[in-house]
Structures are given as structure tokens and as C-alpha cells.
Amino acid sequence: MEELQGYLEKDRSRQQPFLYPLLFQEYIYALAHNHNRGLKGSLFYEPTEVFGYDSKSSLALAKRLIIRIYQQNDFLSVVNDSNKNRFVSHHRYNFCYSHFYSQMISEGFAILVEIPFSLRLVSYFEKKEIPKSHNLRSIHSIFPFLEDKLLHLNYVSDIRIPHPIHMEILVQILQCWIQDVPLLHFLRFFLHKYHNWNWNSFLITPKKSIYVFSKENKRLFRFLYNSYVSECEFLLVFLRKQSSYLRLTSFGLFLERRHFYVKIKRLQMQHLILIVVCRDYFQKALXXXXXXXXXXXRCQGKVVLAPKGTHLLMKKCKYNFVTLWQYYFHFWYQSYRIHINQLSNYSFYFLGYLSSLLKNSSTVRNQMLENSFLVDTVTNKLETLVPVIFLIGSLSKAQFCTVSGHPISKPIWADLPDSEIIERFGRMCRNLSHYHSGSSKKQGLYRIKYILRLSCARTLARKHKSTVRAFLRRLGSGLLEEFFTEEEQVLSLILPKTIPFTFYGSHKERIWYLDIIRINDLVNHS
């Protein structure tokens, strides 16, 4: 760390940052190795083996890769079989090295480009603690704002962010951020060489991303995608400038922890409210703006635009988005990916919630002197529900239940100690209760917790070679009750006047926490 600090201090006197030499420094790969070890705390993390190699990194291997990658005929060779691709036997040794080296280089490159933006690294050098306000920015804070603004809007438009994205476009976007030409040249050369056997896999699609990036090289993939997200935000700012003559009043750039970048823009205008909720490809970011007539939000690759105006205004916004994206990113964007719906009859998926406007009508008898008359009033309420179908799909992918929601055992956890199995299932339930505490109705959440509860019991019964009924009869049903009710006990302390709800109870209080800095893992996998 001292060597890295000395290099950065020497580099501050230069006009352009030169990051390429850092690829040959061994401590960069030590940082990447420590980051990979930290990934094991993820909920769905499962270690992957790289063809028998361990996860250690060394400077000699990094230098060897950089030399080998510039050699034309020493990379991967693939032949097409009738059913699948098979690697030539005498090239398998080279493939193993290439696969392993690619992980090292991608992690090292991700470390380099994150150095100027890393809040924790700067705080380490300056011996300062990270302000608590930076750690308490919650993605739940956007929902009270939406509840206050969306009640007076008419239409909502779902806009899918254009895809697929060619990697060359992402590299060109990085040129505006990083001025180190050798580093960018090496990144472009590395991407082209590693994916030259299948050019179709060189695209980012909404459902299936590049395997090498989405699995082994998550960090580099996130950074490339975040750079594209930043450019999309500039388009939103451009639309804001075209709709108002008021200048930008304030602009702040804040860096969130967990290596995700958050841009917070407060744009004050006369006829437009712009709320940009930046959710990176795997994690969250939050940005808000204030005004009085329309709201736009972007989350998980989808832009939600809700102006207070006519249907004609929505069509104009649709035309602007299509034109700007095609002109700015130089690829075709289909207009049918933009759907315009009436807000009063539409539910949109937003940050793990199904949000919609619920109209409540009431009749009041008004008495004035000797005359009386009835007054009908209609009030709007933002309803946030747990997306049960999406969560069941996530549990099915993670092998906790079937597609129809029938609980099953988790085979890969059956070899763990009983306490570890209960702790993992309990942590999932607590995280779900914590994240979806703002739901208007808890019945869907109870169903998800019930699936996890039975899946935990089936996993324990499978381990002990018994049935669920016999296992619970022997140990008691209270074995699985404690960690399922922990979140409810916390709520009973926060709201002492309310009735604390049990596993089968009902609780209609919505609570938005201020410590939620990431989207729940089950929501990410839906």
C-alpha cells in the first residue's frame, strides 16, 4: 500500500494519469486477490475452480500474460463439433493458462481504474474515517419522494436501455474518463484477442452477458457497464437543458462504498422533475432532483418516465429518446421498446417492488344550515407490493423451490453443519424482511419466508437421512422459529404502539430503512 501511495503522489504532478505501468506491480494483484476473498460473503456466492489453479496472483504470471497476449498464435484455439465446441487436446494447456491469466488481468485492470474513484482508498491514505452519512444513504429514501410526486402525475413510460452494446463502444466511452492511451490500447487488444473465436459473444444482452465477464470478471464488467450508464445520464441531462432555460443549480458527485459509483444530481427546473435512480448492473446507485411537473427514474436497465401532461407529450419524449440514443451511441434502437401506459392503470417494477397508484374513494355528508349534500372524494396512494412471482423465480434458479413454488432441499448445503445451514436460511429471511419492510401487504412476503422455512427443514432432514415431519418432531418446531421472527421483534421495538406480527400474522405498517445500500440478492436474480 505504501508503494501504491508513493506512485499516486508522484503522479499528481502530471497532467495525465499513467496507469499502465501499474499492471506490472505485484501489489495490484494482491489487492485483487483480497477483493476476491471478500466476495465469499455474498448470499449466492459459490467458489469456482479455474482448471485446478488456486486464486493466488503473482507478478511473474501477469508479465507472462502480457507477453503472451501480444503473440498472435499462442492464444486459444477452438474447433466446432456437431453438438458442442471441443478444445483441441494439445491446446488445453494453453487454454488453462489463458483462462487463468484473463481473470488476473481483468481484476488488475478493474483495480487500476477504480483507484481514482475509490472512497475507501482515499480515506485510507488520508487517515480519515468515512462520514457516516455516506454509509447511511439508503435506496429506500427514494420511495417517500415518489409517493409525494407520483400521486399527481398521469402517464408512465417504460423505456428499456438500448442493447446489445458492443464492447468497442464501451472502450470508446472510457477514453473520455481515462487519458492513458497504452492502458486503453491494451484493454481493447485484450478484449478482441480473448473473444476472437466467437464475435457474437462480444455483445452485452439483457438476459445473457458475456460468460467471462459475468462469471469470473464481475468487477471489470461492472466498471464497463457503469461507464455506459454514465453516458446515458448525460442524455437525460441534455433533455433537461432542452426543456428549461434555468441553469443547473447544483451538481454533486458522491462515491458509494462497495465499488459502485453514485451520481447524485439535483436539477431544479420550472417544468420538469428529473429523478435519476442509477442502479448499476449488479448493485444500486441513487440520484434525485427536484421540480414540479414530471418525474423520470432509471433502475435496472429500465427508464421510467412519468410526466404531468398529455399523451402527445409522452410521444415527443419517446421520439427524443430514440433519436438521441441512435445519434450518440451509433447503433439502432427499436422504438417498440418504449411503452406508454396510464399511471392509474399500470404497475411498474422498481427497485424490487411492484409500485402502482391505488385510488381510494370516500363519501362525506356535508351539512350547511338546513341543507345537506354528499361530497365524493378520491385520494391516490402509492402502493408497493412484494413481487412474489419474481422472487419465486429467483428461489427456483437458486434451487430452493420448484418453478411452482414447492419447497425443495438445497443439496450443496447438506454437507454443512446444522448451525451453518440454519444461519444461511435465517440470514436470507432477515434480509428479505428488512428489504421489503416497505411493502403495503405482507402476505406475499410470508409466502416467500414459508418456502425458505420448509426448504431449510428439508435440507436438514436430507442431511440426517430423515423425513421433515420426523425431524421436526424430534427437535421441535421451535428450532426454525427464532431467526424467522427476529426482524419482527426489531419492528416491535421501533413501533411499540403497533401489534408485533408473527410469522402468520398481519402487519400493514410500511417502514423505509436508512441503512439499505444495495438491492437484495434475490431481487437481483429475478
UniProtKB/Swiss-Prot annotation:
GO terms for molecular function: RNA binding. The keyword Plastid applies. Belongs to the intron maturase 2 family. MatK subfamily. It comes from the Eukaryota. Keywords: Chloroplast, mRNA processing, Plastid, RNA-binding, tRNA processing. It is found in: Plastid, Chloroplast. GO terms for cellular component: chloroplast. One of its GO terms (biological process) is mRNA processing. Pfam families: Intron_maturas2, MatK_N. Usually encoded in the trnK tRNA gene intron. Probably assists in splicing its own and other chloroplast group II introns. This is Maturase K. HAMAP family: MatK.
